[in-house]
Curated annotation (Swiss-Prot):
It comes from Rhizobium meliloti (strain 1021) (Ensifer meliloti). One of its GO terms (cellular component) is cytoplasm. It comes from the Bacteria. InterPro entries: Aminotransferase_I/II_large, AspAT/PAT-like, NHTrfase_class1_PyrdxlP-BS, PyrdxlP-dep_Trfase, PyrdxlP-dep_Trfase_major, PyrdxlP-dep_Trfase_small. Its cofactor is pyridoxal 5'-phosphate. GO terms for biological process: amino acid metabolic process; biosynthetic process. Its main location: cytoplasm. This is Aspartate aminotransferase. Its EC number is 2.6.1.1, 2.6.1.39. Belongs to the class-I pyridoxal-phosphate-dependent aminotransferase family. L-aspartate binds at G47, W135, N185, R385. The modification N6-(pyridoxal phosphate)lysine is found at K249.
């Protein structure tokens, strides 16, 4: 009797480590909005997490030059020496942080940096403290790496920022990491030096806890806000802090897929082991382009940030003029995270009662043809995120549609 005759064919069974990870609400909304556009409906999509500017010309030229020089082979595993030197100079110039080249790593986007760090450091059941609202990948990466996300709600009353009291209460002997993002996706909230210091004092008292900071939106801050990163504020924590950044947001290079980080040598070495068996080196062409981005002119960043600030003000003022919505002014990034508690319990023209922020966002999509993302996707309700990385004309039209849709609720 053959094995095939005795073993019944089974369907695919996903590994338990991904059983708690579903399809992202962001992807669901994006897919529905795209389908509606294909049907000819005039949908305005305000869910994109990327700048609407183009990659600077000198960066594109550097990539082209690299291709013509034949720089199309494998590179060093976790970054070319040229890019690591540019990153080292960036950290020193902008953040006052000194790293050796073997304390710097480069990967295929900041998401892979986070994945490498968690995979290299977490044992099953190790805890990672994540303030909510949070970028959706944070908790899923921890789950995949068999860690335990510890979600700490940080609502508008605290400016969507973690407090020292909440951090202290969340730390246990199993805590391995605290993960902070400033400015934040989705809230736009940013930590000043005064906001950070009480948190860093807590971490100094708990030497088993490491800190991962996601600084991806560093250059997109408003109203004279002074960006700082924890390792520059507290040198005593530098040896257990991973400072993550990338070229995607500041330089409009989301598709080039380059993220980087500076941190303790042994952590960086362990992350390289993970990367060696996952993707190996990042794209050689993208790395050459990133050298040009980091070493080249930076003056255009101010103009782009000023454009984002005008759009931020337009959206915040427009949302706060709508009955039932309440929008805090974000310090950075290109998102608003507006409260919508005032519309819960109301009824749509079709007779459906809005019970959650997900219901409200579905109503805006179907009725107003405006795609936004519910706060539940980011771990905090009842809110919704708008990305204002689109034209002012589209934003004005979207705000008019949202206001009209809210007026139709009873």
């Amino acid at each position: 009797m053959t094995i095939n005759a005795t073993v019944k064919e089974a369907g695919f069974q996903p590994a338990s480590r991904i059983s708690s990870i579903g399809v992202s609400e962001i992807l669901k909304i994006g897919a529905r909005a795209a389908a509606m556009k294909r049907e000819g409906k005039p949908v305005i999509i305000l869910g994109a997490g990327e700048p609407d500017f183009d990659t600077p010309e000198h960066v594109k030229q550097a990539a082209s030059d690299a291709i013509h020089r034949g720089e199309t082979k494998y590179t060093a595993l976790d970054g070319t020496p040229e890019l690591k030197k540019a990153i080292r100079e960036k950290f020193q110039r902008e953040n006052g942080l000194a790293y050796e080249l073997d304390e710097i790593t480069v990967a295929t986007g900041a998401k892979q940096i986070l994945f490498n760090a968690m995979m290299a450091s977490l044992d099953p059941g190790d805890e990672v403290i994540i303030p909510t609202p949070y970028w959706t990948s944070y908790s899923d990466i921890v789950h995949i790496c068999e860690g335990k996300p510890v979600l700490i709600a940080c609502d508008a009353s605290s400016g969507f920022r973690l407090t020292a009291e909440k951090l202290e209460a969340a730390i246990t002997p199993r805590t391995r990491w605290v993960l902070l993002n400033s400015p934040s996706n989705p809230s736009g909230a940013a930590y000043s030096a005064a906001d950070y210091r009480p948190l860093l004092e807590v971490l100094l008292r708990h030497p088993h806890v490491w800190l991962l900071v996601d600084d991806m939106y560093e250059h997109i801050v408003y109203d004279g806000f002074r960006f700082v990163t924890p390792a520059q504020l507290e040198p005593g924590l530098k040896n257990r802090t991973l400072t993550v950044n990338g070229v995607s947001k500041a330089y409009a290079m989301t598709g080039w897929r380059i993220g980087y980080a500076g941190g303790p040598r042994e952590l960086i070495k362990a992350m390289a082991v993970v990367q060696s068996q996952a993707t190996s080196c990042p794209s050689s062409i993208s790395q050459a382009a990133s050298v040009a981005a980091l070493n080249g002119p930076q003056d255009f960043l101010k103009e782009r940030t000023e454009s984002f600030q005008r759009r931020r003000d337009l959206v915040v003022n427009g949302l706060n003029a709508i009955d039932g919505l309440d929008c805090r002014v974000p310090e950075g990034a290109f998102y608003t995270f507006s409260g919508c508690a005032g519309v819960l319990g109301k009824v749509t023209p079709s007779g459906k009662r809005i019970k959650t922020d997900t219901d409200f966002c579905a109503y805006l999509l179907e009725d107003a043809h405006v795609a936004v993302v519910p706060g539940s996707a980011f771990g905090l309700s009842p809110f919704f995120r708008i990305s204002y990385a689109t034209s002012e004309a589209e934003l004005k039209e979207a705000l008019e549609r949202i206001a009209a849709a809210c007026d139709r609720l009873s």
